[in-house]
Amino acid sequence: MIILGIDPALGSLGWAVVAKETAQLKYLASGIIKTNSKDAIHHRLAFINSTLEKVILEYQPNMAAIEETFVNTNSVTSLKLGYARGAIMSLIGRYNLDMREFKPNTVKKTVTGYGHAEKDQILHMIKLLLPGTFLITNSDEADAVAIAYTCLVTKNY
């Protein structure tokens, strides 16, 4: 089972690919997709899609796991995040991948044991839980690893 974990965002999206081989979890790859806030939103969404599409084609995941979002007090920010999620979900659908969504607190609790963990705690724990993640320093990338990890360890596939 290969999971593509996604921490959705318009400015800095995190992605990660984690596999389960028998009882062993294996980190395969991760990264961030940064877009320029000065670019038109449709160009930013297209860049996110084309970059994630390359990840899907290279790693051939069976499923995508994406973090659910909360409604921010800034409605414009929430709307833009909704655009990004819609574009990502459309790509997931186009490749006929199953998809699971996880609440941020569920991911935090699964990875750290505490549903209100801070970003640095998540980063620390994924480095302990998944060999190969020691070079990750970006919290968006770490969150994507944590989302994929949550999908695999909760057997939500």
Swiss-Prot record:
Q: Which GO terms describe its molecular function?
A: crossover junction DNA endonuclease activity; DNA binding; magnesium ion binding
One GO term (biological process): DNA recombination
| Positions annotated as active site in the UniProt record | 7, 67, 140
Kindly list the positions annotated as binding Mg(2+) 2. Answer: 67
Residues engaged in binding Mg(2+) 1: 7, 140
Explain how, and how many, cofactor molecules are bound.
Binds 2 Mg(2+) ion per subunit.
Q: Where does the protein end up?
A: Cytoplasm
Which EC number applies?
3.1.21.10
Q: Which UniProt keywords apply?
A: Cytoplasm, DNA damage, DNA recombination, DNA repair, DNA-binding, Endonuclease, Hydrolase, Magnesium, Metal-binding, Nuclease
EC class, as a word, reads hydrolase
> What catalytic activity is recorded?
Endonucleolytic cleavage at a junction such as a reciprocal single-stranded crossover between two homologous DNA duplexes (Holliday junction)
The job of this chain, per UniProt, is described as:
The RuvA-RuvB-RuvC complex processes Holliday junction (HJ) DNA during genetic recombination and DNA repair. Endonuclease that resolves HJ intermediates. Cleaves cruciform DNA by making single-stranded nicks across the HJ at symmetrical positions within the homologous arms, yielding a 5'-phosphate and a 3'-hydroxyl group; requires a central core of homology in the junction. The consensus cleavage sequence is 5'-(A/T)TT(C/G)-3'. Cleavage occurs on the 3'-side of the TT dinucleotide at the point of strand exchange.
Family recorded in the similarity comment: Belongs to the RuvC family.
**What is the name attached to this protein's record?**
Crossover junction endodeoxyribonuclease RuvC
Q: Which organism is it from?
A: Rickettsia massiliae (strain Mtu5)
